[in-house]
Regions:
Chain B
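Active-site cofactor/substrate anionic-group-binding motifs, chiefly glycine-
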Residues: 51-107
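Short cytoplasmic-facing helical segments at TM-TM junctions of multi-pass membrane proteins
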Residues: 124-149, 231-234
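Final/C-terminal transmembrane alpha-helix of multipass membrane proteins
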Residues: 234, 240-257
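Hydrophobic positions within alpha-helical transmembrane segments of bacterial inner-membrane proteins
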Residues: 68, 72, 110, 114-115, ...
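Short, membrane-interfacial amphipathic segments enriched in basic
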Residues: 2-46, 223-228
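Hydrophobic alpha-helical transmembrane segments of multi-pass membrane transport proteins
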Residues: 91-134, 219
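Selective transmembrane-helix segments that form parts of the transport pathway or gating/packing helices
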Residues: 56, 60, 64, 103, ...
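Membrane-interfacial helix-loop-helix connectors in multipass membrane proteins
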Residues: 77-100, 165-210, 214, 218-240, ...
Length: 249, 263
């Protein structure tokens, strides 16, 4: 469903992606792991068309993302949970969740959009009481849940999760991991997650790809990850300071 | 002699010039894109109403107070200056022309630059830093249509009204000072003011307001969208937006004054 071939991206003289090749099948949950600054977020943003790759081809459902005719329809396939939530501060929680349903091609009547928002909030474990609060009034964990509710509000085919557990305590991280897994299975959505939290990887993924040096260093089913012989992968999953990955970056 | 001694300063000058021209080009492209998005759907009416409130209505107190004190001070200055050649009687006329043609629009423009440009730039820059702009795009919403167009349109429409109100309050400030402490007759002061002002004075004032409103809100949006990372990026964007808006407003004021009143 999502294909990346030989994707390159540089910012000024800094080369971030140096030929990324990746395939994600429909309904698959892929987790991209890798150290900070290895280009995980850039990869996701290239698929969404937020950043244009310098070279290479990215296809979603066989359609080149740089040549989508109807951008609105293309983006309607996606839901995204941002690292910091990226909730809109100036509008209440329910309008954040129902943002896509209040405007554009998926516009619904306001009362219906609110009902859907409350249902999605309930799905991520939040009570309807939070619907009228502003995002700044919520804790970090609740903001992540609202972000998750917004990502699934329009029942997207593809969901991206950018560091879904960063900044959360271990229990809340576990709750978010379980929610992501349940929701992805329940919706039958294709999921791409980027993280360096190995607990998330084991909880969320069907397949794992490790990004290092601007390329996919290793990829395979999560069940084969621990037995993978790649020294970079082993150093990453064991969190060892000794190994081929430079610790000073 | 080392040829670098001559070429190095030229290279520095060249780089600075190219950088400035590139910046100007980006700003012009941004302004043209804003105008294009203003006339093509979709339009976000709720955001526009909210911008009308923030840019227009909530700026009334600062505009009113600025105009009132300026009008009063202007009356005192003209009276004491005019006394040097026995021309104290021209206070109503000079206050009127000074407020309507120059001080009203310029001071309102600068106050809007301080209040609105800064807040728009800080808000949009923070949205950029916290990935809210990226989130807008993933939610099929064009950031220029959702953030820039409502604010710039609100600036274009409400700042002329603010200038009109500022002109009236400024004249009132001058009237109050003149009648309470300078011994002018209230009715004849007002009569002189109304008789002296011509339609072109008011028209130029409102036209300046529209241009200054466009500049002030556009600069806030432009620098907000161009913001760098982190708190430093937001601070730099806010500072640059206010400086650019103030300078452009003063430059535009000169050009508009020349266009309206050059003989």
């Amino acid at each position: 469903m999502i294909e990346l071939s030989n994707v390159h991206k540089s910012f000024g003289s800094k080369q971030i992606l140096r030929g990324v090749d990746l395939n994600v099948a429909r309904g698959e949950s892929l987790v991209i792991i890798g150290g900070s600054g290895t280009g995980k977020s850039v990869t996701l943003k290239c698929v969404l068309g937020l950043i244009m790759p310098d070279q290479g081809v990215i296809k979603v459902d066989g359609e080149d993302v740089t040549q989508t005719g109807d951008r609105d329809a293309f983006l309607a396939k996606f839901g995204m949970l941002f690292q910091g939530g990226a909730l809109f501060d100036s509008i209440p929680v329910w309008q954040n969740v129902a943002f896509r349903l209040l405007r554009g091609t998926l516009k619904r009547p306001r009362s219906e959009a609110r009902e859907i928002a409350i249902e999605k909030l309930r799905r991520v474990g939040l009570s309807p009481d939070v619907a009228d609060q502003l995002p700044a009034e919520l804790s970090g964990g609740m903001q992540k849940r609202v972000g998750l509710a917004r990502a699934i509000a329009a029942d997207p085919e593809i969901i991206f999760f950018d560091e879904p557990t960063t900044g959360l305590d271990p229990i809340m991280a576990g709750v978010i991991n379980d929610l992501i897994r349940e929701i992805v299975v329940e919706m039958g959505a294709t999921a791409m997650t980027i993280t360096h939290d190995m607990t998330s990887v084991r909880a969320i993924s069907d397949t794992v790809a490790m990004l290092h040096g601007g390329k996919i260093r290793w990829s395979g089913p999560v069940t084969e990850m621990d037995s993978g012989e790649d020294p970079y992968l082993q150093q990453f999953i064991t969190g060892s300071a000794d190994g081929p990955i430079e610790t000073l970056r | 002699m080392n040829p670098g001694v001559i070429t190095r300063p030229l290279a520095v000058l060249g780089r600075a010039s190219l950088g400035a021209l590139a910046g100007l080009g980006r700003l012009v492209i941004f302004a043209l894109a804003t105008v294009r998005h203003m006339v093509t759907p979709p339009f976000y009416s709720r955001e526009f109403m909210s911008a009308l409130l923030n840019v227009g209505y909530l700026s009334l107190p600062v505009v009113g107070l600025t105009a009132f004190f300026t009008g009063g001070a202007l009356a005192l200055q003209i009276y004491s200056g005019g006394a040097r050649f026995s021309a104290e009687a021209v206070v109503p006329q000079i206050v009127a022309i000074g407020m309507v043609r120059e001080l009203g629009p310029v001071l309102v423009g600068l106050m809007i630059a301080a209040r609105v440009t800064a807040s728009v730039a800080a808000e949009i820059a923070t949205m950029k830093v916290t990935e809210q702009i990226d989130a807008l795009v993933t939610l099929s919403t064009h950031p220029m249509k959702y953030l820039t167009v409502p604010r710039v349109l609100a600036g274009l429409l409400t700042v002329p009204l603010l200038v009109g109100i500022g002109d009236i309050i400024g004249i009132y400030g001058g009237w109050l000072v003149s009648t309470q402490s300078l011994g002018f007759n209230p009715a004849s002061y007002m009569q002189n003011t109304v008789n002296f002002l011509q339609p072109i004075d008011v028209l130029s004032s409102l036209a300046k307001g529209a241009v200054f409103g466009f500049i002030a809100t556009l600069m806030g949006c432009y620098y907000g969208m161009q913001s760098g990372r982190g708190a430093q990026g937001v601070g730099a964007a806010t500072k640059s937006s206010v400086v650019a808006a103030a300078i452009l407003i003063l430059a535009a004021n000169f050009l508009l004054t020349q266009a309206f009143f050059s003989i």
